[in-house]
Swiss-Prot record:
The lineage of its organism: Bacteria, Bacillati, Bacillota, Bacilli, Bacillales. Belongs to the SpoIISB antitoxin family. It comes from Bacillus subtilis (strain 168). Keywords: Sporulation, Toxin-antitoxin system. This is Stage II sporulation protein SB. The gene is spoIISB. The isolated protein is unfolded; X-ray data suggests the inactive complex forms a heterotetramer of SpoIISA(2)-SpoIISB(2), which inactivates the toxic activity of SpoIISA. GO terms for biological process: sporulation resulting in formation of a cellular spore. Antitoxin component of a type II toxin-antitoxin (TA) system. Antitoxin that binds cognate toxin SpoIISA and neutralizes its toxic activity; unlike most antitoxins it does not seem to be highly labile upon expression in E.coli. GO terms for molecular function: toxin sequestering activity. Disruption phenotype: Decreases sporulation efficiency by 4 orders of magnitude. A double spoIISA-spoIISB disruption sporulates normally, suggesting its only role is to neutralize SpoIISA. Gene3D superfamilies: Single helix bin. Induction: Expressed during exponential growth and sporulation. A member of the spoIISA-spoIISB operon, it also has its own promoter. The keyword Ribonucleoprotein does not apply.
Length: 56
């Protein structure tokens, strides 16, 4: 038998489109923010979590 049939591997050309995975979260830690802004971000995160718990 041919080698391609033994391995049962698809050649790379058979998949012309690359599947991109969507990032689930974005990172805020990549840049520095003022302490005031950091507090606002933290408070927003807390409120979003509280809202999600009430909706669930």
């Amino acid at each position: 038998m041919e080698r391609a049939f033994q391995n049962r591997c698809e050649p790379r050309a058979a998949k012309p489109f690359k599947i991109l995975k969507k990032r689930s979260t974005t990172s805020v830690a990549s840049y520095q923010v003022s302490p005031h802004t950091a507090r606002i971000f933290k408070e927003n995160e807390r409120l979003i979590d509280e809202y999600k718990r009430k909706k669930a």
